[in-house]
């Protein structure tokens, strides 16, 4: 999603691969996978971000998600 990151592509891809493997291991359909990932994002925001910043971060995350979907739609 972000244009630049302090994390290496390799590290991001490794975590992504491991998370996909867990979802596949549990044969999670798309709706369940999205629900679990959404709950994970909510938990991270609520436990790791100061209350005053939560809405701003959630909005920014949602905008980045929408932008990445639009970008993927144009590529197909």
Curated annotation (Swiss-Prot):
Coiled-coil stretches noted in the UniProt entry, renumbered to this chain: none
Domain of life: Bacteria
Short name of one Pfam family: DUF1414
InterPro entries referenced in this protein's UniProt entry, alphabetically: UPF0352, YejL_sf
Matching SUPFAM superfamilies: YejL-like (SSF158651)
Family: Belongs to the UPF0352 family.
HAMAP family, A to Z: UPF0352
Protein name, UniProt field: UPF0352 protein ECA2748
């Amino acid at each position: 999603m972000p244009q630049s990151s302090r994390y290496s592509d390799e590290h991001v891809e490794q975590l992504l691969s491991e998370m996909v493997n867990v979802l596949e291991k549990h044969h999670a359909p798309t709706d369940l996978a999205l629900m679990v990932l959404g709950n994970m994002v909510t938990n991270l925001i609520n436990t790791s971000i100061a209350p005053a910043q939560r809405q701003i971060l959630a909005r920014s995350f949602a905008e980045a998600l929408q932008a990445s979907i639009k970008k993927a739609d144009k590529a197909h």
